[in-house]
Amino acid sequence: MRYTIKNEYLKVTVDSKGCEIVSAITAADNREHIWQADPAAWKRHAPVLFPLVGKYRDNSVTYNGRQYHMTQHGFARDMEFEPVKIEDDKLTMCLKADASTLEAYPFFFKLECTYRLDGSSIAASWRVSDTQDEAMYFSIGAHPAFVLDGHESLTGCRIGFAMDRYGVEAVNPDTKAEGISYRLLNAEGLSLIHI
């Protein structure tokens, strides 16, 4: 099911499958800003990545002696979220652990995703709760794709982040990440590929 929130600047549509933004249209010019999921290039719009960002080696991990299988970027993007609160300019949806998630991920969780319109911006927030009293390991992220109308060439384009430092640090600085075969960010910024 799809839900729409709007204000005087934006109209945003979110699909309950994956709690994925599938459309963001500006009121002033009726322009779509979200990639419209052409399967020839990429079938998604703006998936929520949980409980894994990236992938496990061989798509599996062992935890407490049991092996769990999970594909790249986790399962949330392919699951049905339930609406929690729907307002004109704000939507909160929820995904909870169930028998199918426990086959891939050994933790009882509750993931709440909220999209709130703030003027001409979309504020996204996630709240992950451990519904049992044990350490819960996870990662979470977003993978939005945008429409770049009017750009014949992206030569010279770059995306910058207004941060003095990145907010992610190594859990154990003495270990080395394995299985990563490319760098997306470098001194020049984020690489863009025009398809």
Question: Language model features by range: what are they?
Answer:
Residues K6-E8, G18, K55, F75-D78, ...:
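Residues that act as N-cap/strand-start positions at coil-to-secondary-structure junctions
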Residues L10-V14, C113-Y115, I159:
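Broad, structure-driven detector of short, well-ordered beta-strand segments within folded domains
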Residues R66, M70-G119:
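Extended, loop-rich substrate-binding clefts of extracytoplasmic carbohydrate-active enzymes
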Residues A97-H151:
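Acidic, contiguous internal or C-terminal segments within carbohydrate-active enzymes
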